Amino acid sequence: MESVVRRFAAACAAEDPEALLEILAADVVLVSDGGGRVLAPLRPIRGAVEAARIAVTLMSAAALSIEEVNGRSGIVLRRAGRVEAVVSLEVSESLVTRIWVVLNPDKLAHWLNHGNGADPSRG
């Protein structure tokens, strides 16, 4: 699973939806939670092409790091040193079948309260 998470992060960092399509299941679902406080899709996004477009857009110009999210590898997005989103993936047979993107600042409290959301690799 971690290799799929790394490929997902690399494709998003490169803003390369075609590379992302290689690891997305055709019927992948992207669910985002902005909590009404930040801009995020209001409904689940279904299908690889649209999910790839949304994922790349959400993660563009962000510093991405692979970190433990809900007990498994996930992706933390930072801009200007602040956590803006946490991404968790469900993987089946080496393909991403579900993408959860938490953008809601209230739900990011754990990440924001540990080092102010700063990148832990920066010391």
Per-segment meaning from a language model:
Residues 1-123:
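C-terminal and inter-domain tail/linker signature
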